[in-house]
Amino acid sequence: MSDSSIVNLSKEGDSNFSSATINLSKVDDTVNVSNATINLSKVTIDPSNQMSNPSNQGINLSKCTKVELRFKCMNLKDMDTFSKSDPQIFVYEKKGNNNNNNNSKPILIGSTEMISNNLNPVFKKTVTIDYHFERIQNLKFEVLDIDGGGKNDTIGDFSITLGNIISKPGKKVIGEIKCNGKQTGTIEIIAEEIQETGQNIILKLQGSKLDKKDLFSSDPFFKIFKSSANGNLLVYQSPVIKSNINPIYNPIIFKLEEFNGGDMFRELTFEFWDYDTIGDNDFIGSFKTTTDEILKGQVREFTLINPKKLSKSSYKNSGKIVFTDARLIAQPTFIDYLSGGCEINLMIAIDCTASNGMPSDRTSLHYNTPTHESEYARSILAVGNVLAPYDSDGKIELLGFGAERFGGVTSHCFQFGPKAEARGIEEVLSTYNKVIPTIKLSYPTNFQEIIKHAHKKSIKGVDSKNQKYTILLILTDGEITDMEETIEEIVKASSKAPLSIVIVGVGIASFELMKKLDGDENQLSDKNGVIATRDIVQFVPFKKYENDPEQLAAETLCEIPEQLIGYMKSQNYFPNMKN
């Protein structure tokens, strides 16, 4: 540090100041603040100076930018015996300034799709990440061979900072995938900044008189590409429509920034192909356009051209494509769905296993008196009081699991109390207090049946016009013994059910398995390698927030809005008109 120092001052909002006293001293390389006075009337504040210390935490140093990452791999090591590998890329971010910082766990940011039997895969699904210029963002790209029959095999991984990708020409990096120090393939990563628009685009395409590539017809599908400095980038590939030269495709919905990067005049290419089970697919034809042209409707019908046929005098085109629907809609919010009539249903499941202790015992987690509320009772109140107002009819299904029932058989899903449903949290609590002393606690602790029950009930009568969403609140004191079966049920529900599962851990157990079910650090997958399409589980230990019920509720329920929106989008359900 020199004898003269520069002090940067910033002013936020409408704060007024005229002078400040700052105490400065220096010991070795440490600057201590002690005594200095600055007359602010003689200080010029440059509003363009945004520089600050990147190590300062809790301060938003710059607005983050959304960056889309897309991938392809080359010459992957074949991990299978009788076929080629089925690769999938998982992207992790490790917090901290050093890749060797072992104190921080990598966080799963996203993943690509799995591509079957391919050692040179080009992935369609991208991963979007927030880019902070002022932070070092260490990324790890793990390439797995997805094994449908058991444990996935690691092909290898590649690590780099996001800043290094962004700074490369064309924002493109090619790196070596390694496993145990040996190269097992090559990965290409292309980054693209995307402008958030808050808009979705809906497209519906219909074909007419496409070329017959097979004996009597074609099996057409299409691909959408957006132009970039690195060539055309694949945005979407449609399902195949069998034996139809006049195909009508289901509507497709994109975030506008994913579709065109927020640029309405960016060139788009639509390619149509004939699918062949054996051999290469046959090119039918293509056309180029822009989002602006599609939406304005100046041209809604496009001609497919195959350049190889242009030299033929009799050639006119290879078919026509019409956009029967093309429009922008705002990205829906949680409140939009609620305002449109989406019903929220609450289910509460209570752990009745012997590990809780007899309810009459003062050390029991179920010991509950007017002067001593049990952790179960306090959890019901804290979380239930937030959720209950959203429950459309006020009826809350109350379940139990892990108790001995009729004939001495342990039930892992049963009606808790004389009625299947309670009206409001007060009745839930009243029923709990009356019934728990009469329950014969048993073992083991299993979740599968409870989740299966919630899954089946949540999907009844749900469609785009009758939107419903169920929240299953599970209160438990320990680890489960049916982990594999529970994961399988969660994975099934993640793709099919309008369901979120909230788990509150009661007591002092480690809850390591509950943390795994949460899926925040590692994407949940079942024994067959099937990966959960949505993160639908949130776990919170009660002890951490027992003196702050509001924070307990906030931590427990913070992911629900995004989980509901994620399900609705996966089903192409948009908010209904407000009543």
Curated annotation (Swiss-Prot):
| Pfam families from the UniProt entry | C2, Copine
Q: Which residues bind Ca(2+) 1?
A: 80, 86, 145, 147
**Which GO cellular component terms are attached?**
cytosol; plasma membrane
Q: Which Gene3D superfamilies match?
A: C2 domain
Annotated keywords: Calcium, Metal-binding, Repeat
Q: Which InterPro entries match?
A: C2_dom, C2_domain_sf, C2B_Copine, Copine, Copine_C, VWF_A, vWFA_dom_sf
Domain of life from the UniProt record: Eukaryota
UniProt record, GO biological process: cellular response to calcium ion
Q: For binding Ca(2+) 2, which residues are annotated in this chain's numbering?
A: 80, 145, 147, 153
Give the cofactors, semicolon-separated: Ca(2+)
* Domain VWFA positions: 345-552
Q: Which residues form the C2 domain?
A: 45-175, 183-304
* Single GO MF annotation: protein serine/threonine kinase activity
Please give the positions of the paired cysteines in each disulfide bond. none
Q: Does the keyword Protein transport apply?
A: no
- The reply on keyword Metal-binding is yes
The record ties this protein, via SUPFAM superfamilies, to: C2 domain (Calcium/lipid-binding domain, CaLB) (SSF49562), vWA-like (SSF53300)
Q: Which PANTHER family match?
A: COPINE, COPINE-B-RELATED
Q: Which family does it belong to?
A: Belongs to the copine family.
| Name recorded for this polypeptide | Copine-E
Q: What is the lineage of its organism?
A: Eukaryota, Amoebozoa, Evosea, Eumycetozoa, Dictyostelia
